[in-house]
């Protein structure tokens, strides 16, 4: 096995930055650090990263995708890992727009963590930083009596994970079991 160590940072400031990371090994399998928080649910798998990661991959081709919010260019790279190699990667993310400087602030007001979610509190803590959201709203939802992980949170602002730059709120979706086909969100 080869070990990949990645350092993610803002290309302009040089500051470490949080991002989501997708790594595929030579067999086409998703790889993540053993202790990482994973995105659970449909779509491309990724792990949340607060700036540095380390993981092992078998020898062969490795594809890496690093993404942060909507204002940064995705960083894609491919490399070849030889057995027992130690690969140190510097992963600079380039910002293509600075919308907050124009008084536009990114956010997501419609997030669910489904019944398969294993670390909802860690994920809600990381979500605004990895996506660079100023506002994050996680929705409570009742559908087919599934135990949505997001339903474990109390309604209102989550002061324990909100910061001066990232507000995390728990809202309730206005569609439930009785008429789920007629809902319009929060």
Q: What is the meaning of each model-derived region?
A:
Residues 12-37:
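Short, ordered, surface-exposed loop/turn motifs in non-cytosolic proteins
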Residues 10-12, 68-70, 95:
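Surface-exposed loop/turn motifs at beta-strand-loop junctions within extracellular Ig-like
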Residues 50-52, 66-78:
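A short, solvent-exposed loop/turn motif at the edges and junctions
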Residues 79-99:
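Extracellular beta-sheet/turn segments enriched in Thr/Pro/Gly and aliphatic residues
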Residues 21, 45, 59-69, 128:
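A short, solvent-exposed beta-strand micro-motif common in secreted/extracellular proteins
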Residues 2-11, 21-23, 62, 91:
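A short, amphipathic beta-strand motif
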Residues 104-186:
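Catalytic cores of extracellular degradative/oxidative enzymes
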Residues 43-46, 50-57:
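Short, surface-exposed beta-strand/beta-hairpin micro-motifs centered on an aromatic residue
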């Amino acid at each position: 096995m080869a070990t990949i160590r990645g350092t993610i940072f803002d290309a302009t400031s040089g500051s470490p930055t949080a991002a989501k990371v997708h790594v595929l090994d030579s067999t086409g399998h998703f790889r993540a650090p053993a202790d990482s928080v994973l995105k659970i649910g449909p779509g491309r798998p990724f792990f949340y990263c607060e700036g540095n990661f380390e993981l092992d991959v078998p020898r062969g081709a490795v594809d890496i995708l690093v993404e942060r919010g909507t204002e940064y260019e995705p960083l894609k790279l491919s490399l070849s890992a030889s057995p027992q190699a130690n690969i140190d990667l510097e992963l600079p993310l380039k910002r293509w727009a600075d919308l907050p400087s124009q008084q536009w602030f990114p956010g997501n007001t419609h997030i669910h963590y489904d019944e398969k979610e294993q670390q909802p509190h860690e994920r809600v803590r990381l979500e605004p930083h990895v996506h660079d959201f100023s506002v994050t709203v996680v929705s409570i939802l009742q559908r087919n009596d599934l135990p949505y992980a997001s339903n474990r949170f109390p309604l209102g602002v989550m002061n324990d994970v909100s910061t001066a730059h990232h507000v995390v709120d728990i809202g309730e979706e206005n569609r439930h079991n009785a008429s789920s086909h007629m809902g319009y969100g929060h």
